[in-house]
């Protein structure tokens, strides 16, 4: 299973890379806005920093506009993946980009049928938002299971990229189901390594070590 970091913060990306827990990066307009920098500047810096796939999201809502943005972003590097919303115009754009050999990440997926459409259009990745579904009392991880079952039934190449990850349990469940990728905020990446018994055990070992006679 691959871990992507869901961030446009270069400092966070560097920390995740140093941990060996960053196989790729996903960004979106909201994350870029938090940096206070232009999207072009942010994308250039991330491309220079991270060797894995980097999702850059279009803001146009019509297919032609999406294609213009996608072709411009793709020029920044081979690892750039164009992030496109799961709407009809987005599917049109994904189909064209697939034929041109441009990698795509179809985002804002909230149903298995939507994910099926993304795969048929030729998406490289589909991003189901598990946390947002949980927020409205639906089962985000059941959606992941449904999509994976459909993709396996028909041998689709599209990879399931679990998004809107809120806590370590989302990552655990995604891994158990066999999802290809989880894109994770840096705060949750840090939580993955934590367990109260680990902390308590380390504290005891260090306390006992102090009792060992020193020469």
Swiss-Prot record:
Q: Give the primary localization class.
A: cytoplasm
Matching CDD domains, A to Z? Transaldolase_FSA
Q: Name one GO cellular component term.
A: cytoplasm
User: Keywords of this protein's UniProt record, alphabetized?
Assistant: Cytoplasm, Pentose shunt, Schiff base, Transferase
Leader sequence range is none
Reaction catalyzed: D-sedoheptulose 7-phosphate + D-glyceraldehyde 3-phosphate = D-erythrose 4-phosphate + beta-D-fructose 6-phosphate
**Cytoplasm: present as a keyword of the record?**
yes
- Give, as in the UniProt entry, the pathway in which the protein acts: Carbohydrate degradation; pentose phosphate pathway; D-glyceraldehyde 3-phosphate and beta-D-fructose 6-phosphate from D-ribose 5-phosphate and D-xylulose 5-phosphate (non-oxidative stage): step 2/3
> Which residues participate directly in catalysis?
83
Task: Tell me where in or outside the cell this protein is found.
Answer: Cytoplasm
Major enzyme class? transferase
Q: Tell me which Gene Ontology terms the entry assigns under biological process.
A: carbohydrate metabolic process; pentose-phosphate shunt
Gene Ontology MF: a single term: transaldolase activity
The EC number(s) attached to this protein equal 2.2.1.2
Instruction: State the protein's purpose.
Output: Transaldolase is important for the balance of metabolites in the pentose-phosphate pathway.
What family does this belong to?
A: Belongs to the transaldolase family. Type 3B subfamily.
Protein name (database record): Probable transaldolase
Gene, per the UniProt record: tal
């Amino acid at each position: 299973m691959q871990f992507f970091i869901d961030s446009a913060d270069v400092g966070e990306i560097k920390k995740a890379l140093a941990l060996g827990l960053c196989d790729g990066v996903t960004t979106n307009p909201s994350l870029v806005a938090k940096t206070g920098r232009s999207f072009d500047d942010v994308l250039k810096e991330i491309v220079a920093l991270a060797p894995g796939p980097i999702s850059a999201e279009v803001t146009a809502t019509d297919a032609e506009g999406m294609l213009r943005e996608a072709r411009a972003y793709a020029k920044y590097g081979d690892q750039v993946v164009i992030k496109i919303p799961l709407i009809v115009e987005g599917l049109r754009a994904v189909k064209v980009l697939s034929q041109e050999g441009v990698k795509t990440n179809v985002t804002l997926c909230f149903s298995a049928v939507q994910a099926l459409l993304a795969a048929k259009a030729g998406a490289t990745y589909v991003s189901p938002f598990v946390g947002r579904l949980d927020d409205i009392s639906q089962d985000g991880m059941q959606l992941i299971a449904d999509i994976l079952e459909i993709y396996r039934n028909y041998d689709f190449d599209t990879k399931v990229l679990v998004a809107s990850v809120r806590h370590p349990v989302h990552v655990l469940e995604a891994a158990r189901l066999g999802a290809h990728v989880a894109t994770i905020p840096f705060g949750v990446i840090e939580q993955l390594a934590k367990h109260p018994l680990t902390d308590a055990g380390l504290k005891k070992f260090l306390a006992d070590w102090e009792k060992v006679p020193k020469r």
